[in-house]
Design a protein with these regions (language model features):
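Intrinsic-disorder-associated interaction segments
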Residues: 2, 6, 124, 129-132, ...
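An N-terminal structural lobe/cap that precedes and organizes the functional/catalytic core
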Residues: 2-124
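Generic surface-pattern signal
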Residues: 14, 18, 22, 136, ...
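Generic structural hydrophobic/aromatic packing signal, biased to beta-strands
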Residues: 47-50, 135, 226, 269-271
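Generic detector of ordered, mature protein regions
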Residues: 69-76, 80-81, 117-118, 143-156, ...
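Internal, well-ordered alpha/beta segment that forms a basic, Gly-enriched binding/recognition surface
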Residues: 76-181
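Charge-dense, low-complexity intrinsically disordered regions
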Residues: 184-389
Length: 389
């Protein structure tokens, strides 16, 4: 589920429905079961890469397992729900559930990502092959989620049409907005088509050449891990880079690829993009290159917090993250404009894009906590934890 939808559901299940005879615990359980059922049914028939029938699907990790093991505590990790304190989704994840997907076979999982998932390869220059593998992996997880979300939102829409006489259903869909659900179905359909096209090009066609924007090695283990593609809406100059609220198939989003990989006693940060898209990010790259290292790390965190729900956090950092008002403020943005267009606006697309540029502006990076600094490293957090025993 996306930031906005999960927040709406979380707010909904916190309400008291005792006056209509509904137990909130049962409601939470029903929503969770509906989500799990929809997600379970949303599976491809064959591996989306090799297309060979009959092969067993692999429980693939978006972030390499050697990275996850570095920051896990007793095999556990925390995701963004730990920050939002969502009552709907489990906050703590085991290694087997940490940002995984099941849409490719075991053979493809082992073969197609072998170079970038080898930690020794990060001591030298990042190769085109490594960046190609990262880009492919970055497409597979959101592709899997788009398939699941389409199934979930379709189930919700069907429920809204068949439960019109239910007081609870009326309250629920008044809160969640049927218009929003329909818009999300349209968006996921567009995403699925676009991901399918991109995966086909990367796996079967001629892949892009990539340019590294920033590669940096920290001499300590950061407590946050991330790997994903980011469709930056804007940078530091109020320019529109990607209009993520234009669901027209002709609107092709141009992402940057971002990795934060904690290793033992070191952390690698990698930011790159397709060479053909560099001109779109010219202003962002120019400003980013002039920011000092500490500032760059804050920009990286702000981008992750604003755009993604797939980063993972060491339990050692849990209290700092969940109680930090600056993080809460960042997550409170969650821009989504379904049903929120002021009366009289004629050009809705332009209005939404202008609002998005304001909300996603990166100039507030200085307000982001220093969670990638040595102060919050795994080494320091473990030392502090030992002292408090």
């Amino acid at each position: 589920m996306d930031h906005y939808f999960d927040s709406m559901v979380a707010d909904f299940v916190k309400k008291d429905f005792s006056d209509i005879g509904v137990d909130t615990r049962d409601l939470r359980k029903n929503i969770t079961e509906m989500t799990k059922e929809a997600y379970h049914d949303a599976k491809p028939e064959t591996c989306v890469l090799c297309k060979v029938p009959g092969k067993k699907f692999c429980n693939s990790h978006t972030i390499p397992q050697f990275v996850l093991r570095t920051i896990a505590q007793d095999g556990k990790l925390l995701d963004w729900n730990a920050i939002l304190k969502s009552p709907v989704v489990d906050k703590e994840k085991g290694m087997k559930q940490a940002e995984t997907f099941k849409i490719i076979c075991t053979e493809c999982d082992k073969k197609e990502f072998a170079e970038y998932e080898n930690p020794s390869n990060y001591d030298g220059p990042v190769t085109q092959k490594m960046m190609q593998e990262i880009t492919l992996k970055n497409l597979l997880n959101p592709y899997s989620k788009a398939i699941k979300d389409k199934k979930l939102f379709t189930s919700l829409l069907n429920a809204s049409e068949h439960l019109l006489d239910s007081p609870l259903a009326n309250l629920m869909f008044e809160s969640l907005s049927v218009a929003y659900i329909k818009e999300k179905i349209k968006a996921t359909e567009t995403d699925i088509k676009d991901y399918t096209r991109q995966i086909h090009i990367l796996y079967h066609g001629k892949p892009d050449q990539y340019d590294v924007i920033w590669k940096y090695r920290l001499n300590y283990t950061a407590p946050i891990a991330f790997q994903g593609e980011i469709n930056l809406v804007t940078g530091f100059n109020h320019e529109l880079i990607n209009n993520i609220y234009d669901y027209d198939e002709k609107n092709k989003l141009k992402p940057i690829e971002l990795c934060v990989f904690p290793f033992l006693n070191q952390t690698y940060i990698l930011l790159f993009l397709a060479k053909r898209d560099r001109h779109l990010y010219r202003k962002f790259i120019k400003k980013f290159s002039k920011i000092d290292v500490n500032g760059k790390m804050k920009v990286i965190l702000l981008i992750i917090f604003l755009y993604s729900d797939t980063f993972l956090v060491s339990p050692l950092l849990a209290e700092e993250v969940s109680k930090n008002p600056k993080v809460q403020k960042t997550f409170s943005i969650l821009p989504d404009f379904a049903g929120g267009i002021p009366h009289g606006v004629e050009d809705v697309s332009m209005y939404v894009s202008q609002q998005a540029v304001k909300e996603y502006d990166l100039n507030s990076y200085q307000d982001v906590p220093d969670f990638l600094s040595e102060q919050y490293s795994i080494e320091h957090l473990k030392a502090d934890d030992t002292e408090n025993l």
